[in-house]
Amino acid sequence: MEGTPKATAEIFEVTKSEVNGALDEKSCGAVVALRLQRAKTGEDALQLLHEIFVRCRDEARTARSRSDDACEKAVHICGNTAASLASVCLVRPGALGKCSQQSRETLASALLGKATSLRPEFLQGALAKVSPELLKDVAKPLVDQCCEELKPATATEIDVDRVCGALNTWLRCAGKKVAGAALIEHEAFQVPPLERPSGGDPQPPDEQDNNFAALLGQAGMAQDQAAQWGAMLRGVQRSVNRGLPLERTCLLGLLLRVSGGASYRNDVPLEAQARGLRELMQRVRRPQDVPSATRELTQRVSVCREAISSLIEGLVRNGPQSRENTLQWLTALLNRSKPGRHAHATPATRLGACAAWLRLCRPFLGDEKKEANAVASLDYLKSDLGKAAYPDDLTCVNVAPMPSSAPMDVDSDQEMYDDDGDAELKAALELSTKPTQDFHFVTRCFFLASRAVTLGVAAELHHTVGMDHRPHRAAAQVGWDHDLTRAMLAEVVAREAALGSESVIDDLQAFSACQCRWLLRLSDDDLRRCPEFLLEDACTIPCELNSMKPDTLRRSKPSPDLLKLCARCLGATDTLVKSPHAREKLGKALYDLFLPVTAKDKTYTEKYMYRQPLQENAGNVELLANASPEIAAKLCPAILWLFGDAEHIGDIYQIADQRLRIAALIKHLWDAPVHRAAFRTIVADVRAFVTFANGLLNETNKLVAGAIERLPEIRNHQVRTGLLDASNDEFRRLRAEYESANDTRREELDSRHSEHEQHL
């Protein structure tokens, strides 16, 4: 091209008369280079090349519309040349002049929405010509800017969505197998070392111990005792939250940390959470504000987690190197999320990781052929990632642990603060960074997702029991305008929004059904050795979801596999499943999920916790009422056995609740013909029937004894309130005491009387 451009401030015009069939790749390069040389101050080469590329594409469409093949070909060459020069800008910043010095930063800003966006086809053309060895240098500014966006405490779901969108665009445009590999080369995608990064130079351990000892000595403690306690306090100071480095220094951890909506914690007092719940406390002032705030926050959390899950899925699908690094990082998070003082990530991080694992499992859930790829054995627990995610001390379903009767001594107190667990954690973490054995991807996803569900959703669902009515009790004491009451309302919104996403609930239900089918495929020996939480989660998660959101059960699919699992595990009495907690969860699942509402009655605990009314699933009710003779033959004796064995299953304080549930099951099954026939054959199992009869008599005796103890208290309160005459001096004293009592004391006496009457 000769002469000056028509408009130096605009992109050159390409017409048929100017081209005349002589425009080739070389001349196109000269044209584009001339435009870059005449770039104004502040203009960036990457943006200029993108404008040229877009204009050439528009001109190519115009030429195609008028069937000008020569012009269309020439313009295509010019556009491709612009994309090729863009790759030069990214590989060698400054190679095309001053305007190309910040091209990598411009690319990162454009992907994050801080600058004019770049078309995917332009990015694909530019990044395709960058070698895999240099692609990681091009990706580094992008990852750095993503981390800077998320590190402030004010980061929101909008920032997460923007970062995930930028990284997903990179994965789509930078090429299969190489895009993810370039990202994970960055230190923000690596598993950090076990030791916590310190903010400054720490004092030597001995000097710090001496500081503690000196303070205790000043308080009057003996020298040797002060030294011992100083060492112990130093151990407490070293016991840091091992999940925090993954949340504060790693990009995936930063994303997951913000994904939970409002920030709440389980291990700190509610008063200390005011900062994280401040926004919700301003929004939610009364119970009627909770539904709308919950819907809004749930939608935000859902969009945020879907974006993170999409990013993790993109990393896993991009290539083997990216997939292995991502799985190892997520496994390290599981390793550091197990309950205990050494490793406990925040609820938002654990729930976000759980949603990501469920997203990875989504393609095979419900597909019988694909689910069969999850090997029906416990061999994966012996692999490197399996050992890192699953502690060696997990309780098995065939184990019935007995509480220790040994008295606590000083050594046991010291064990609470030593750092012996660091060695175990470090060894497991090292395993999580080694290449895994050759297990099918479905097998790996199933086992690791099962652990993520236990540490994430299952752990958090437990905290939702009775949470709806805690603010009402607080308001009765301090009023609705008190910060504590408003913080409780905000916590209700935060917890339900973090757990109540429709997509996550659907994935959880599908995954629980998959767990049931996998457990049914296990041999008896493997089922006995199976970690207890796998069986418990398959039973409790649908129940807890029904408790938190009663509509969940009504709109869910029937659960024939769960019914078969209950019949198999309970039908063998205690020979297959000895764990008392697992047996109690199996019976509770039958009561919560398979009984009609008319057959249920609230237990003592449910009445005390103001539990929402349970719903029913018509499909499940039909499954139980018309069960096969094989299931009925196993289930009926097992339920009688559970009733009589209630003292030995579950929590000792829940014996009455367990028997109420089992009694409702027995009553309902007796009305079904197939189960009544099974009950009539119970005489063949003398041991189960005797256990049931003993349990029935024991429970009756216990209730009668409790009623006899409470009758005098009920009579005394009736005398206090004037329902009965005060016929002697003792009764007159009780009435005078009640009449002279203040309102608080009267409420206490009335409440105790209501509890006694409720017991009767």
Where would I find each of the regions flagged by the language model?
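Extended alpha-helical scaffold domains
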Residues: 2-760
